[in-house]
Amino acid sequence: MIRTISSREVYRNRWTRVREDVIERTDGQRGIYGVVDKDPATIIIPLEATAEGEFVYLIEQFRYTVGGRHIEFPQGGWEMAEVDAEEMARGELREETGLMAEKMTYLSTLQIAYGVMNQQQHVFLAEGLTMGEAEPDLEENDLVVRRVSVQEFEGMLLDRVIVDNCSVAAWGLYKVWRERDKLNTDLHRCR
């Protein structure tokens, strides 16, 4: 196991902290490891079932770090040490899309990029959606909300229109959860 010898913070703002750790590897050699500390976040799959089929709501926004506009599920975090994950998910959903959910289902907690960052992301399914007024942050003033069919969404994944790893992972998790839920429902019907 890698052991931490020392740690020092090299940068901080209200969203991110960066530290450099001096480490000792299992073979006894020392080195450094850069770690990005971020507070927990949420990602929300806003799913709407209608007579015409199933639809998801997506966000299109400019992502500064990669220099372009990208499409993804609503996601983000709050700059607070302790906050309820579902409360944060409901807040992010309302803030970015204007949507309010009658039902929120917790699916899992994922590590976003544990090779460099310790941030966790709580994954929620939002159903029973009602449209309200979006309240984006200053950094999100260019958000565009899109409602697309599940088939169109999955096509966007395969065509690399959506490349956000968190959205791809959340959708894969949802698909597995949904299949397991269907299987459990079918098993209960057989009894």
Q: For the regions a protein language model found, what residue spans apply to each?
A:
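Nudix hydrolase/Nudix homology domain
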Residues: 2, 6, 69, 117, ...
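Conserved Nudix-box catalytic region and its N-terminal flanking loop in Nudix hydrolases
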Residues: 33-39, 45, 52-91, 139
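Acidic pyrophosphate-coordinating catalytic loop
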Residues: 9-13, 64, 110-122
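A short coil-to-beta-strand element that immediately follows conserved catalytic motifs
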Residues: 3-4, 100-107
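Short, well-ordered beta-strand micro-motif
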Residues: 20-22, 46-48, 125-127, 147-149
